[in-house]
Structures are given as C-alpha cells and as structure tokens.
Amino acid sequence: MVYVRDILRKKGSDARSVSPQATVFEALEVMAEHNIGAVLVLEEGKLAGVFSERDYARKVILQGRASKDTLVSELMERGVFCVGLSDDINTCMAIMTLQRIRHLPVLDEGGVVGVISIGDVVKETISDQKFTIRELKKYITGSHGPEIEAD
C-alpha cells in the first residue's frame, strides 16, 4: 500500500502558498512559475483555504472580474478537505472523487507539510500497478532472472 508520506518523500513537500490578501493575479503568477494548478492560502501560518485554476475560471473569468483587483480571500475554497501522512492513496482517491477536487493539503501535527494532487495519485497508482504486474509475471513464469517489463 502506498501512503501520503511515500508520495511526499518522492515529490518533495514544498507546498506553494499565498496570503488571503494576495490578488488573484499574484496567485496565478505563483501557479504559473511553479507549474501547479492550485496554491494554499495561509493566514498566519494556518491553512485558510485553497485557490485553484478552476476557481479562477469559474469565479473570475466567467464573472468578468479583474484578476489584479480581486483578492484571493474573496474566492478561495474555505471548506478544505485534508489528509495526513499516514493516509493511504485509496483514501486520497476516494476524497478527490467524492468531493470532485484535485488537490489535498497534507497536515501533520496541525501544520501543512505538503499537497497531494490528482496527478500524484494517478502517477503512484500506475507505478504500483506496474510493480504488481511485474511480480505476477515473475510468479506465473517461475522467473527468478531479470525482471519482465510491464506494458
């Protein structure tokens, strides 16, 4: 089983954030600079919300608002679902699917230690499945030699 801590160990735990007083434009700059789809909104070091590309599309563009004049605090998602380091990938997948979200902040001892995206979950799931396929092929063929590549 793959756990959140395993994913963060591989990808790093650097979570990008902005303050609630940041403009939407500033949040978009951070997302573009780091090639990410969402930023955490931290107020005095505490998680206050999440602002995503989806929020921008639906709450700025479609409503004709100006990104340089709109504060993140006006549009961010406040009821944020989070996971912990000991949660497994299936828990992340279930939350993301049921809540129709793409990013999960990771908390440990009350503080933010990272973010898991739907891309991270898919990548890890594929990797885990490839490993399982290789092991099953070795078992079925009785092969103890070089690993057989999974397609």
What are these language model-derived features?
Residues 17-35, 82-100, 107:
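The conserved cystathionine-beta-synthase
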